Amino acid sequence: MHRTVKRILCGIGVALAILVIAAGGLYLTGYLQVYGLTSGYQYLDREERARIVFSRNKLRDIDETLDRVHREGKILCVNGAELRAALASKPKALVYIFTDGCTSSACLPLSTIGAYAHKIGAEPYYVAIDLTPGLLKRTEPILSIDYTHYGTKWHDSFYEAFIKDLTGRSTDEEHFNLVLFEKGRIVSIFSTEKLLQQP
């Protein structure tokens, strides 16, 4: 009886090891794509990568640059500090930090955020956390986090650093994905859940 159980457990262990090795191999060769672990840049093909523009701390006029990049069908990657500095000249700006393709109730459509921003007299800015092919199909001007600025491709690391640069806060302090600025000063930080609770 013990031998049978031992053989079954050994067989299960071998099967799991083979499965892990196979999944690792598929991931390393690019056949298995897991979004949310890294920036997503490595999953973009050559044409898609050519449509990603890294500002490299040279962002001067956010609206002019974002408009030009958007007309070219590209995405502008920025770091948190330069985005905050660029918003200093804006009377009121609402930054929505989102994950493309998210279906959670915490993720609202960009059109909903845009309508809310206009309702409160703010200019909306959409910042994608990860780079995905779907972002390139969006009709709105899209910003994304410049993971290269933070020296890592790992999602949690560059996201935390971006939030710290943009707001001076840690993602551990509270959950938020909306930041309201007035002339570069943070007026409010809140989540889409709180936005939905407003009358």
Q: What kind of feature is each model-predicted range?
A:
Residues 1-72:
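N-terminal targeting signals for export/organelle localization
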Residues 73-85:
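A short, well-structured juxtamembrane/interface segment
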Residues 83-113:
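Short active-site neighborhood of thiol/selenol oxidoreductases, capturing the structured segment around
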Residues 90-94, 120-123, 182-183:
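Loop/turn elements at helix/coil->beta-strand transitions in domains of secreted/extracellular proteins
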Residues 99-105, 131-133, 186-187, 194-195:
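Short acidic, S/G/P-rich loop/turn micro-motifs used as interaction or catalytic elements
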Residues 105-145:
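Structural microenvironment flanking redox-active thiols in thiol-disulfide oxidoreductases
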Residues 132-174:
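Thioredoxin-like thiol-disulfide oxidoreductase module
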Residues 173-191:
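A short, hydrophobic beta-strand/beta-hairpin element that forms part of a small beta-sheet core
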